Each structure stands twice: as C-alpha cells, then as structure tokens.
C-alpha cells in the first residue's frame, strides 16, 4: 500500500473520489467499503461526502439516502490517534474513577523528573524510567486495561474525543482510494476488549502512551511539548487485518 500522499491529502482524495458518485461507479475497494458501512443499498444511490468537523474524530462524513456515516481515516505507520495536555487527561482519569494513586504514578512517568507536576531538576528518558520503575508501569497497565476503562479510552482516543458533544465515529478506514482495510466501531471495541496485549510500556489495549517531547535537554523551544501526552496505534494495520479475518470466519 505504498503511497506518498500526506494524511490530509489522502482524506481529500477519498472525499473527492466519493462525492456525487453513484455506488455503481466506484472501484471494487470503495464499493465494498460503502456496502460494509451502509448495508445492502441500491447501486444507483448517489453518495455525498464531506470533511468532518474540525478538531473532531471523524475525518469524513458520508451521506446516502439521508443516512449518515462518520469515518475516521488513517494511513501509513506509527499512527498517532490522539493528543492532549496531560493535566486535562489527568482530569479525565479522575472523572472515570481511576484511583488517585494510579494517576500519580502516571504523572510521575510522564514528567520523568521525580515529581507529579514537572518541577523536578533532573529528567530521565522513558527507557530509563522503565528500567527503574517497571513495576509501577505494570500497576498502571493493570488498571487502564480493565474492560470498563478500556471502553472509555477507546471512545476518547478514537471514536469521539474529549467532548460528549462531539460526533462519534462509525467506522475506521485505513488506506487510500485504491486499497483499504476497515472496521466498525463495535468491531474495534470488541477486538480490544477481548484480546490481551502484553506491552512493557503504558498502554490501552494495542494503543500506547507517550510524551510528545520529554525535553531532556531543557530546550525552551520544546518545553511546551513536554506538557502533552500522545496516543499511538502502531499495530493498527495488523489489528485491522485480524479483525477482517475474524469477520470472514463468522
């Protein structure tokens, strides 16, 4: 699936390709995707496609016969699916009843300077932190990967984002116009909840937590990035292939 277009260009190409076409005019890949998300509909139906709302999880909104489906689009490797200030994320953790001692351990991992607020004078890398405090990371992971919490994280990172007022993703599409892999919201949740992901870093199922920039050299130009957490889905394509295989075997 070699492709040099950027993520935004790819989204634009998908929208432009789909918009105002009849289903029967699509290539086999896109026809299959449309039938997946809309079910068995008339091939004479005309597709309306547009960009999702700025800052929200759906990248593309598809409407056919007044039925709306919201799609998150991904491509390439090392897919970053979410980022926000760590202080906002900590407030979210409190709101879903993550114990305060777990939040404290997460903040100490995030800042890597012996404090839970980033004021320490010595900073260490994620690798060094794991060498010293792997037990704390394991405790965090045990809590984060409980089913009730995983569902909250998947909703925040992939499906809806930071506000309950935001639109919710119906399906995730990985690829371009010519070739793609996909899964519905329910398939993704079921896959993440029902599988064990053994990682030595902080994770939420197959999604991994990282700091945008630990700023180990105290560079004032990147200091603000130290305040931001990111979530990546490095195994996205492989996980979608597994979901597709499971779907075909049902």
Segments and roles (model prediction):
Residues 1-58, 62-69, 74-250:
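Short, positively charged
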């Amino acid at each position: 699936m070699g492709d040099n277009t950027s993520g935004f260009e790819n989204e634009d190409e998908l929208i432009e390709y789909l918009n105002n076409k009849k289903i029967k005019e699509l290539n086999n890949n896109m026809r299959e995707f449309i039938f997946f998300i809309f079910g068995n509909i008339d091939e004479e139906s005309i597709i309306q496609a547009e960009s999702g709302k700025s800052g929200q999880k759906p990248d593309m909104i598809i409407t056919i016969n007044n039925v709306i489906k919201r799609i998150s689009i991904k491509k390439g490797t090392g897919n970053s699916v979410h980022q926000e200030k760590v202080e906002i994320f900590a407030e979210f953790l409190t709101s879903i009843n993550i114990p305060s001692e777990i939040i404290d351990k997460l903040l100490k991992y995030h800042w890597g300077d012996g404090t839970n607020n980033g004021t320490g004078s010595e900073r260490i890398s994620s690798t060094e932190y794991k060498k010293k405090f792997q037990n704390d990371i394991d405790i965090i992971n045990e809590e984060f990967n409980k089913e009730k919490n995983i569902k909250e994280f998947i909703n925040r990172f992939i499906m809806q984002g930071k506000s309950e007022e935001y639109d919710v993703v119906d399906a995730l599409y990985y690829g371009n116009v010519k070739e793609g892999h996909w899964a519905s919201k329910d398939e993704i949740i079921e896959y993440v909840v029902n599988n064990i992901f053994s990682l030595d870093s902080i994770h939420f199922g197959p999604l991994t937590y990282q700091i945008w920039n630990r700023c180990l050299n105290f560079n004032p130009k990147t200091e603000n990035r130290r305040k931001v957490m990111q979530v990546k889905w490095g195994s996205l394509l492989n996980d979608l292939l597994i979901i597709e295989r499971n779907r075909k075997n049902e």
